Amino acid sequence: MTGLPSIEIQPVISGIDSPGSAVERPVCVCFYVFFPAGGIGRYTNELARALGARSDVEVEVACTPDFQWAHDPGYRTWTGLRSISHPIPLLRRFRFLQAQFANPVRFLRRAVNAGTDIIHFANVNHLSFPYWRRELEESGLRVAISVHDVKRQKPILNKAWEEHQLKAVYRIADALFVHSAYQADELVTYAGVARDKIHIVPHGPYPHGHVAHDAADVRKRLGLPLDRQVALFFGQLRDEKNLAGLIRALPLSKNRPHLLVAGEGGGAHRGADFYRDLARKVGVADRVTFLARYIPDEEVGELFAASDWVALPYSNSFTSQSGVLNIAAHYERPVLVSSSPVLHETVRRSDIGVACDGDEPGALAAGIDQLCTQVMNNYSYAFAQYRQQFSWDENARLTSEVYRRMLLAKPRRISVGGGTSVGLTV
């Protein structure tokens, strides 16, 4: 909007490493989590716990009342976001769309009232960004975003509109956190953001508790072979995870591993019945076991412990880090990855599995044979080094350093309501 006065907000650095400061105080950070559960929620929970254990950061997580980790003692929660859950699909969809508009506004007002220094989006409601953008700009809050997926695989309503708004959200942020060099480059190319706003932080391992039952007992209960390697494909069945390519690779492999598929489909993605039919068509139905349901946390560790290795045959359109890979690292199970760029980069760097040359069945079969041979020969994978390099404490250390620089940065001018507004140069 033309004719608006220019606005400049100075960084609030009193008591935070500013010259002549007598007293240091923690940086006050409020996270925004839109979904009540899932991978991003778990990531935010682990990061908030690691940050909350530090003396230089004070953490609050703004979430829905049914957020799975709302009562975690490692940080403070504010459960004032509108819930998107409902047993009736149509009403759940309505709540989801309603919350796209309501929750960012609720969050921003909470952050301002709580005296927050930095807001950190675990999710961004880019669909409704024009609705809450002015409230964000006028708040004067510093903005950080965890970018788990640079692009969205599927639109909510309109792809062109949503891509435009997503890029706008990225550009208004003061700091963007990614998990790989590939994602950093992708973000620069996609949204045109400055490279110095992007910070690479590790995605830590996901613990799922103690394994109560012996691996052999779990295999017997699930009808899995005791005399053959078992590969685990775990998580939601999504098309870009390339389970079809993995099943087609099984008859091409010189080894004969058994595949356990644990998880269910969702939305417009193909479900378990499609993959059962495919296994029959390629002649490996007797070598694939389906556990086609939601897997509760208390069962996750058992499935990983009962498996010899974990299959992540994701296609190159899958450009985020994988929570499944980090569960595998926790339970010290090597992984098979294909051409998914972030996973390929991670495994090449850390020696915790085999990175295939592509995601087509032939390349996957070659990778399967290589990994089966390594497992059979008791290959020593670098899990200890991985857990040290990709730890939550290291993530929190790097993240807190960025927070400090955000508070000390010189203000930059961006648009307010179409004219000029505030941001920071980090």
Regions inferred by a protein language model and the residue ranges of each:
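Acidic donor-binding loop of glycosyltransferase active sites
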Residues: 302-319, 333
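Conserved donor-binding/catalytic core segment of Leloir-type glycosyltransferases
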Residues: 225-241, 247-250, 259-260
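Glycosyltransferase donor-sugar binding loop
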Residues: 65-68, 205, 258-276, 293
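Acidic anion/phosphate-binding donor-loop and adjacent secondary structure
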Residues: 13-15, 185-189, 196, 204-221, ...
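N-terminal strand-loop element at the rim of the active site
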Residues: 6-7, 12-15, 33-38, 49-102, ...
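Nucleotide-activated donor-binding/catalytic signature segment of Leloir-type glycosyltransferases, i.e.
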Residues: 272-298
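A short helix/loop element that forms part of the nucleotide-sugar donor recognition site in Leloir-type
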Residues: 210-224, 275-277, 376, 380-381
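An aromatic- and histidine-rich active-site surface loop
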Residues: 100-108, 119-141
